[in-house]
Amino acid sequence: MTAVQWRSHLTDDQQRQVRDLVTAATQVDGVAPVGEQVLRELAQQRTEHLLVEDQSPGKSAIGYLNLSPAHGADAAMAELVVHPQARRRGIATAMVRAALAKTGGRNQFWAHGTLAPAQATASALGLTPVRELVQMRRSLRQLPEPVIPNGLQIRTYAGTEDDAELLRVNNAAFAYHPEQGGWTEADLAERRGEPWFDPAGLFLALEGSEGAEDSPRGQPRLLGFHWTKIHLDDPGLGEVYVLGVDPAAQGRGLGRTLTMIGLRSLAQRLGDRDLGRESTVMLYVESDNIAAVRTYQGLGFSTHSVDTAYALAAPDAALA
């Protein structure tokens, strides 16, 4: 293994190698080792990249760690992957130690799928679970008809003229959330640029014309939205990508209505394809959001996997 080296920029070839590394790990483990945001960051200079290369003439990537900076009260976050053929050589441990040294022990680590090797590495280094993100799934068969309350308008995304209201509702609904809160126009633009983006899969719930005088430019006010996603690399899999309801509009059943509208749309769009297997939908929810977990269970979802964030319990003592 070569020396661990931090980079603020990856070449096109290094980005390709990291993507190949992620693909190799996913095929063996059955779960992606890093989130989609990490893949978006490969071409950017907003995060730090730790690349471990083998000693072959081509210097192929056998280990990678992405470190996103801290934002306000939210800790810096690391996500890492080691090539299946290069495991049990101390590469993951070396990368974790390098990240802890860089942040003074104050960053967290995502372990997607909470696999046994990740648990063992965390335990050996004194890392403890601080957050759990539950992935839930259900079949897209036998979906009930959504009940649309009186005075509610449902339409799909019309373009950038909807962005201001989308950001307002998103940032109000997820004010507490490390990844989903605080979005800007740039965040929306990045996702519109993704190959999977389909405006017909972004549903908006707006109040009737009687509330229009209270909204910008006299247009109906956005109460909530459901952004769906079809996974292009996993035929037959859809996702509740973002489901947000304005806190001022909660208690009206909008979340359930929007969920079912989006699921029926996913079922129709995926049903148009010759998949050879049953279509499925997934979503992520914080494990401590008991109300949301129970709501999704009531809609037929069950736990598929759990992602765990680890951190040092006492950074100063551990690194002293």
UniProtKB/Swiss-Prot annotation:
Protein residues bound to acetyl-CoA 1: L80, V81, V82, R88, R89, G90, I91, A92, T93
Reactions performed catalytically: 1D-myo-inositol 2-(L-cysteinylamino)-2-deoxy-alpha-D-glucopyranoside + acetyl-CoA = mycothiol + CoA + H(+)
Domain N-acetyltransferase: 16-141, 152-320
CDD domains from the UniProt entry: NAT_SF (cd04301)
Enzyme Commission numbers on file: 2.3.1.189
Residues that hold acetyl-CoA 2 according to the record: 243-245, 250-256, 289-294
Subunit architecture: Monomer.
UniProt family annotation: Belongs to the acetyltransferase family. MshD subfamily.
Protein name as annotated: Mycothiol acetyltransferase
